[in-house]
């Protein structure tokens, strides 16, 4: 599947948490212990002064053992199956629709559209979902860095 990068509409914003999503910060750990509930109470309130963002390419910006979360709304211009790609290093997840409406620490990784969990070098996690034109859908993506570089890119394409 080829997914082309597009600019996202305003209304997306970023939140930074001073904690890694997984208690295991060793090498290429598995995603078994990736746990969004670890983020509760670790929101960095003094950090997010960027306001809304219009594209997601957060590579080389995540501090080691931090987690960044992109939140907002996605409004497709065409009905049909949309492809999403999350490029992440390390643990990363992307949710669309009602699965994305929870607070970050209440998200369920088992219903993520894109699942790039665990410790690993930059890699892609792909997913597709049927969306209706003109409807607003919640979108949330989370990437944590355990060290050794980072990547956080969201790409998408419509039908």
Language-model features: locations:
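Acidic/polar, compositionally biased interaction segments
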Residues: 6-159
